[in-house]
C-alpha cells in the first residue's frame, strides 16, 4: 500500500512538472541556437555596448541578447502554454511586447530614463487593472486586506521598482542572468506547489532562456542581454511575485503563509542594492539616477575580484537568502523581514571592509616592492 502511494506521488509530481520541463528545455534550445546568429548580425550592424568609465568591460560587446531570450521564452509558451482570452493574460503578454520593443529602441538609440519610467508605470497600472494586484500583506505589520487605492499603489511601486532593480543590477557578466534564473526557478516551483501550474510555466520558460543565455554571458561575455532582456526579466519576475502572493493569500492552507516576505527574499539583492545606492547618492547631494560604480558588484570588482567570482559569490548569497527565507517560514513575518534586512546590511559592511582591507594591503605591498595579484 505504501509502495502504491509512493508511486502515485511520483506520478502526480511528474504530471505537475512535465510541461514545466518541456517549457524549460524548449526555451533553452531555441535561445541556444538563436544567440550565435544574433551575435553575428549585431556585429555586422555595429550594435555594440561601448566601454566607458562607469562600465566594467574593456572592449565593445554585442548587446540585445534579450532578443534570443524572449524568442526562446515565447516559442516555449506558444507550444506548451494554455493561452486564453482572459484579461490578465492579454495585459501580461501585451506588456511584455511593449517592454521588449522599448528595450530594443533603448539599446539602439538610448532612450531617456523618464520616457522608460512613464511606460513602466503605464504597464504596471495595466497589470493592476487586470486584477493582478497586491491585495493583502498577510498580517505583515498587522495589515491584512488593503484598500483598493493601496492595492494599485503597492502593485505599481513593486512592478516598476523590481523591473528597474534587475535592470540596474545588470552590471557584470552573468549577474542579472544568474540572479534571474535562480529567482525564476524558485517562483516556478512554488507557484506549482501553490496550485498555479499554468503561471509557473512562464517562470520555467524564461528560466530556460536565461540558462542558455548564461552560456554566452559568463566572463568573458560574448553578448549582453541589454535593456531588451533586463527590462522584461525584471517585469516578469515582479508580476510572478505578485501572483505568488495572490494565490497564497487566497488559499485556505497556503504553501507560503509568509508569502510577502518570501517574495521579498526572491528579489532582495537587486531591490536592496538599488535602494541603498539611491539613498547614498541622495545623502551625498547627487541625483539618485546619476550612474556611478557603487553597486554591490562594484564593491567586489573594485577590490580586484573577477567578474566571474563576483557574480558567483553574489548568486551564492542569493541562494542562501532563498533557503533562509523559506526555512524561517514558521517565524513572524516582521521578524523574518528584520533578519533579511540585517543580513543584507552585514553583507554590505563586510564587502566594504574587504575593499578597504585589500586596498590598504595593496598600498603596503606596492610601497615595499611586494607584487599584488
Q: What are these regions, as identified by a protein language model?
A:
Residues 2-41, 46, 70-86, 90-97, ...:
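Alpha-helical transmembrane segments
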Residues 50-62:
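Juxtamembrane helix-capping/reentrant segments at transmembrane boundaries
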Residues 75-87, 105-111, 129-141, 247-248:
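Transmembrane alpha-helix boundary signature
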Residues 91-120:
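Hydrophobic alpha-helical hairpins/lids featuring a short glycine-rich hinge
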Residues 97-98, 102, 119, 123-134, ...:
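Membrane-embedded alpha-helical core segments of multi-pass
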Residues 145-157, 200, 258:
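Membrane-interfacial loop-to-helix junctions in multi-pass transporters
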Amino acid at each position: 500500500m505504501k509502495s502504491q502511494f509512493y508511486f502515485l506521488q511520483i506520478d502526480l509530481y511528474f504530471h505537475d512538472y512535465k510541461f514545466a520541463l518541456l517549457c524549460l528545455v524548449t526555451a533553452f534550445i531555441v535561445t541556444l541556437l538563436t544567440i550565435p546568429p544574433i551575435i553575428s548580425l549585431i556585429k555586422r550592424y555595429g550594435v555594440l555596448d561601448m566601454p566607458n568609465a562607469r562600465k566594467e568591460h574593456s572592449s565593445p560587446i554585442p548587446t540585445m541578447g534579450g532578443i534570443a531570450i524572449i524568442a526562446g521564452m515565447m516559442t516555449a509558451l506558444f507550444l506548451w502554454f494554455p493561452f486564453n482570452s482572459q484579461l490578465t493574460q492579454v495585459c501580461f503578454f501585451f506588456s511584455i511586447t511593449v517592454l521588449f520593443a522599448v528595450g530594443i529602441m533603448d539599446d539602439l538609440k538610448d532612450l531617456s530614463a523618464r520616457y522608460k519610467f512613464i511606460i513602466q508605470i503605464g504597464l504596471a497600472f495595466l497589470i493592476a487593472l487586470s486584477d493582478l494586484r497586491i491585495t493583502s500583506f498577510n498580517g505583515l505589520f498587522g495589515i491584512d486586506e488593503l484598500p483598493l487605492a493601496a492595492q494599485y499603489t503597492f502593485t505599481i511601486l513593486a512592478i516598476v521598482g523590481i523591473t528597474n532593480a534587475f535592470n540596474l543590477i545588470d552590471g557584470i557578466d552573468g549577474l542579472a542572468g544568474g540572479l534571474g534564473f535562480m529567482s525564476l526557478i524558485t517562483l516556478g516551483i512554488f507557484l506549482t506547489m501553490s496550485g498555479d501550474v499554468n503561471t509557473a510555466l512562464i517562470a520555467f520558460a524564461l528560466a530556460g532562456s536565461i540558462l542558455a543565455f548564461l552560456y554566452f554571458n559568463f566572463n568573458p561575455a560574448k553578448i549582453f542581454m541589454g535593456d531588451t532582456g533586463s527590462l522584461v526579466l525584471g517585469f516578469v519576475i515582479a508580476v510572478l511575485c505578485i501572483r505568488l502572493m495572490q494565490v497564497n493569500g487566497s488559499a485556505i492552507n497556503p504553501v507560503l503563509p509568509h508569502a510577502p516576505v518570501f517574495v521579498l527574499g526572491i528579489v532582495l539583492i537587486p531591490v536592496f542594492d538599488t535602494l541603498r545606492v539611491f539613498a547614498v547618492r541622495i545623502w551625498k547631494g547627487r541625483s539618485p539616477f546619476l550612474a556611478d560604480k557603487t553597486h554591490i558588484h562594484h564593491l567586489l570588482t573594485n577590490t580586484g575580484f573577477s567578474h566571474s567570482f563576483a557574480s558567483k559569490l553574489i548568486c551564492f548569497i542569493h541562494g542562501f537568502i532563498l533557503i533562509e527565507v523559506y526555512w524561517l517560514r514558521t517565524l513572524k513575518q516582521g521578524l523574518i523581514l528584520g533578519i533579511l534586512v540585517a543580513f543584507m546590511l552585514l553583507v554590505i559592511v563586510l564587502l566594504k571592509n574587504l575593499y578597504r582591507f585589500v586596498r590598504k594591503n595593496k598600498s603596503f605591498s606596492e610601497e615595499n616592492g611586494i607584487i599584488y595579484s
